[in-house]
């Protein structure tokens, strides 16, 4: 999808229309704009709790993608007989009133420009053959990529942008939560749902905006935050990048756009190619500005000493599992301290943070089996997540780690086949399904069975179950009391957790 808009994004009252509004990144932006009392509409082929939440704050949702959707706000002025639904643009005004406000230029936020065609927002997932997209071009609507809207929001705030191949969602959520608990009331836009604000976005009244900024399609270079964080850099998204050098160049450009860059020294690529203003590390790099020392790894979390430039600030409890989440918490400490927060305030917030959905999220228990949903879909993410799970077994909380993994994208599976083959060393049993295409073609002629064979060369207990629906019959036969069953992947495997749970009862 290409942006064809010329000029700045208009936040003064011109409507926004999102193509694929139910997506995790699109919906967060739509929510913030709707909460700002801007006219928001969008289309999505599926009705979900995410689209329901958007409707609850006034967005108009269409369940088809046709050019006529783009005329919605203009149509309000020619059909004044019907009242707006409660909470819709105009805050419950009749259509006559919103039409009048459009001509007079007045509403609760200043102006509604409903006489204008909307600003259309797309993500990379929308292809140029999409009928609604083609309609937007034909109607000469300004068309923006999702990242253009986020970049504009960051630019008008004191922006804090969290980048990195892994850990963006948890780190940005942690930072947002710390600032919120400290009373700074930031606006938060992240790529996962968080119970603390009951969704993937929160509109605050403060001057800060905390956002997860994405490198997957190269749009990271659009952002100019006051504070940037880079958690790590690795080759991923082989559908967009051919080499690690291409990824590094994107991050170097992002670094040049940040007033202050905070970077993790535990990543060799960050050490070699970036020059962060502020650094953090676990116990490996004593030169880091922020360090975690004396790590006590426990079944219910980790306790660490936090050091700031050679001075011990105190201890911190990280309830999220795994060393990677200690690292994510250190990034939040670094941001909080940069903003002048006292360490006890930061530590208390981190200790009470319960994480984001689909990040080691407990989905239920049955007959001594614990069911976990996790978004891990890259070999490094699998290694970190399974190491965290194994830590819980080591401390006696569970007896076995069972990894149920749905590979995500043919290109990723093909590119990282060797790395995937050794990524399951901390699992006692591995169950692999067929590959979730995410809309990709398969020029590699690769299947999940190929990955199962590769993993089987390094692991003695691998089962290939290609069809997701077959898991409902298979897993209850092999799962046993004391198992920690992890459903892993960025596709739709998580939709099988509830049926498997029910089948185990």
From Swiss-Prot:
Reactions that this protein is recorded to catalyse: UDP-N-acetyl-alpha-D-muramate + L-alanine + ATP = UDP-N-acetyl-alpha-D-muramoyl-L-alanine + ADP + phosphate + H(+)
Enzyme class: ligase
Keyword field: ATP-binding, Cell cycle, Cell division, Cell shape, Cell wall biogenesis/degradation, Cytoplasm, Ligase, Nucleotide-binding, Peptidoglycan synthesis
Primary location recorded for the protein, binned into one broad class: cytoplasm
Pathway stated in the Swiss-Prot or TrEMBL entry: Cell wall biogenesis; peptidoglycan biosynthesis
Subcellular localization: Cytoplasm
Residues involved in ATP binding: 164-170
One Gene Ontology term of the molecular function aspect: UDP-N-acetylmuramate-L-alanine ligase activity
Gene Ontology biological-process entries: cell division; cell wall organization; peptidoglycan biosynthetic process; regulation of cell shape
EC number annotated for this UniProt entry: 6.3.2.8
Keyword Cytoplasm: yes
The keyword Isomerase belongs to this UniProt entry's keyword annotation: no
GO cellular component: cytoplasm
NCBIfam families named in the record: murC
Family from the record: Belongs to the MurCDEF family.
Biological function: Cell wall formation.
Protein name in the entry: UDP-N-acetylmuramate--L-alanine ligase
């Amino acid at each position: 999808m290409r942006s064809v808009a010329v000029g700045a994004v208009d936040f003064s009252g011109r409507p926004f229309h999102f193509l694929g509004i139910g997506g995790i990144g699109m919906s967060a932006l739509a929510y913030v704009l709707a909460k700002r009392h801007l006219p928001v509409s969008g289309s999505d082929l599926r009705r979900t709790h995410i689209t329901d939440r958007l409707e609850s704050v006034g967005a108009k949702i269409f369940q088809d993608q046709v050019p006529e959707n783009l005329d919605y706000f203009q149509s309000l002025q020619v059909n004044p007989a019907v009242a707006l639904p409660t909470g819709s643009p105009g805050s419950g005004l009749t259509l006559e009133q919103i039409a009048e406000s459009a001509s007079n230029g007045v509403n609760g936020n200043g102006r509604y420009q409903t006489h204008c065609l909307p600003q259309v927002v797309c993500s990379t997932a929308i292809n140029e053959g999409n009928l609604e997209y083609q309609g937007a071009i034909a109607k000469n609507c300004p068309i923006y990529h999702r990242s253009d809207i986020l970049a504009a929001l960051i630019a008008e705030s004191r922006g804090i942008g969290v980048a990195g191949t892994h850990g963006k969602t948890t780190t940005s959520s942690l930072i947002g939560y710390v600032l919120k608990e400290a009373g700074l009331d930031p606006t938060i836009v992240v790529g996962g749902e968080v119970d603390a604000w009951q969704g993937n976005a929160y509109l605050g009244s403060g001057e800060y905006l905390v956002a997860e900024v994405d490198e997957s399609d190269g749009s990271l270079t659009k952002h100019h935050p006051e504070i940037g964080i880079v958690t790590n850099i690795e080759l991923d998204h082989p559908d967009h990048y051919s080499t690690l050098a291409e990824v590094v160049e994107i991050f170097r450009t992002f670094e040049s756009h940040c007033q202050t860059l905070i970077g993790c020294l535990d990543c060799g690529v960050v050490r070699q190619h970036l020059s962060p203003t502020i650094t953090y590390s676990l116990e490996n790099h004593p030169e880091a500005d922020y360090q975690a020392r004396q790590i006590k790894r426990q079944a219910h979390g980790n306790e660490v000493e936090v050091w700031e430039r050679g001075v011990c600030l105190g201890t911190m409890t990280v309830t999220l599992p795994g060393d990677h989440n200690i690292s994510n918490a250190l990034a939040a400490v670094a941001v909080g301290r940069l903003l002048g927060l006292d360490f006890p305030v930061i530590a208390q917030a981190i200790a009470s943070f319960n994480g984001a959905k689909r990040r080691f999220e407990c989905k239920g228990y049955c007959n001594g089996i614990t069911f976990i949903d996790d978004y891990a879909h890259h070999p490094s993410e699998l290694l970190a997540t399974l190491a965290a799970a194994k830590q819980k077994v080591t401390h006696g909380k569970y007896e076995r780690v069972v990894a149920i993994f749905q590979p995500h994208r043919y290109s990723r599976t093909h590119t990282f086949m060797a790395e995937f083959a050794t990524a399951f060393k901390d699992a006692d049993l591995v169950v692999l399904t067929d590959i979730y295409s995410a809309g990709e073609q398969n020029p590699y002629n690769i299947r999940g069975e190929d990955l199962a064979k590769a993993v089987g060369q390094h692991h003695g207990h691998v089962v290939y179950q290609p069809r997701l629906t077959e898991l409902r019959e298979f897993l209850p036969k092999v799962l046993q009391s004391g198992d920690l069953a992890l459903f892993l992947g960025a596709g739709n495997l998580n939709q099988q957790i509830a049926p498997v749970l029910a089948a185990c009862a």
